[in-house]
């Protein structure tokens, strides 16, 4: 069942240590099939160097039930499911504790758009969620993590298609894309922007966001209706 998608999700998960986004097993990647009926996700707590495509777990999106796989799915499965159910434009999701993005998450800070590297991928600041309540933490924690991400985008009027990443307060980053590989790509860029942003703020503590005109130019030339970047 979904053998190609399992292979794709395995490859995306293996890309996390290759890009230095994870330590030990601190991360996961998932993707949905074309019908958006099924999600394939990394198994919980399995080391990357022994993981195979057969270890990937198939979960029904509507019910959250495991329909194929001998291992337990990632503990973050309910977060992934919440995002897939809410946003049809998301086809793949990555969660990591990558060092510099997690620094911003732990500080509870949005990552401003300070330069064109950021603007090429994210149409504005990458938001950090609010702190979760005690009830949310002690209840269905992973599901509520997804809900607080959705709340952040909806209350701020942000588009998850235009800003394909979020920082979860005191936790770490999630990134997404049209498929698993695209989500990993965005997670790599997020980590690089977080790294550059940390030093930019140290050098210039009052640094304002980049010019709106420059943000528009770089984002829209790649992603706008009249995009002209690339082949």
UniProtKB/Swiss-Prot annotation:
<dbReference type="InterPro" id="IPR001303">
    <property type="entry name" value="Aldolase_II/adducin_N"/>
</dbReference>
<dbReference type="InterPro" id="IPR004661">
    <property type="entry name" value="AraD"/>
</dbReference>
<protein>
    <recommendedName>
        <fullName>L-ribulose-5-phosphate 4-epimerase SgbE</fullName>
        <ecNumber>5.1.3.4</ecNumber>
    </recommendedName>
</protein>
<comment type="function">
    <text>Catalyzes the interconversion of L-ribulose 5-phosphate (LRu5P) and D-xylulose 5-phosphate (D-Xu5P) via a retroaldol/aldol mechanism (carbon-carbon bond cleavage analogous to a class II aldolase reaction). May be involved in the utilization of 2,3-diketo-L-gulonate.</text>
</comment>
<dbReference type="GO" id="GO:0016832">
    <property type="term" value="F:aldehyde-lyase activity"/>
</dbReference>
<dbReference type="GO" id="GO:0005829">
    <property type="term" value="C:cytosol"/>
</dbReference>
<feature type="binding site">
    <location>
        <begin position="74"/>
        <end position="75"/>
    </location>
    <ligand>
        <name>substrate</name>
    </ligand>
</feature>
<feature type="binding site">
    <location>
        <position position="97"/>
    </location>
    <ligand>
        <name>Zn(2+)</name>
    </ligand>
</feature>
<feature type="active site" description="Proton donor/acceptor">
    <location>
        <position position="229"/>
    </location>
</feature>
<feature type="binding site">
    <location>
        <position position="76"/>
    </location>
    <ligand>
        <name>Zn(2+)</name>
    </ligand>
</feature>
<dbReference type="Pfam" id="PF00596">
    <property type="entry name" value="Aldolase_II"/>
</dbReference>
<keyword id="KW-0479">Metal-binding</keyword>
<keyword id="KW-0119">Carbohydrate metabolism</keyword>
<feature type="binding site">
    <location>
        <begin position="44"/>
        <end position="45"/>
    </location>
    <ligand>
        <name>substrate</name>
    </ligand>
</feature>
<dbReference type="GO" id="GO:0019572">
    <property type="term" value="P:L-arabinose catabolic process"/>
</dbReference>
<feature type="binding site">
    <location>
        <position position="171"/>
    </location>
    <ligand>
        <name>Zn(2+)</name>
    </ligand>
</feature>
<dbReference type="GO" id="GO:0019323">
    <property type="term" value="P:pentose catabolic process"/>
</dbReference>
<dbReference type="InterPro" id="IPR036409">
    <property type="entry name" value="Aldolase_II/adducin_N_sf"/>
</dbReference>
<dbReference type="InterPro" id="IPR050197">
    <property type="entry name" value="Aldolase_class_II_sugar_metab"/>
</dbReference>
<dbReference type="GO" id="GO:0008742">
    <property type="term" value="F:L-ribulose-phosphate 4-epimerase activity"/>
</dbReference>
<keyword id="KW-0862">Zinc</keyword>
<keyword id="KW-0413">Isomerase</keyword>
<dbReference type="GO" id="GO:0019324">
    <property type="term" value="P:L-lyxose metabolic process"/>
</dbReference>
<feature type="binding site">
    <location>
        <position position="95"/>
    </location>
    <ligand>
        <name>Zn(2+)</name>
    </ligand>
</feature>
<feature type="binding site">
    <location>
        <begin position="27"/>
        <end position="28"/>
    </location>
    <ligand>
        <name>substrate</name>
    </ligand>
</feature>
<comment type="similarity">
    <text>Belongs to the aldolase class II family. AraD/FucA subfamily.</text>
</comment>
<feature type="active site" description="Proton donor/acceptor">
    <location>
        <position position="120"/>
    </location>
</feature>
<dbReference type="GO" id="GO:0008270">
    <property type="term" value="F:zinc ion binding"/>
</dbReference>
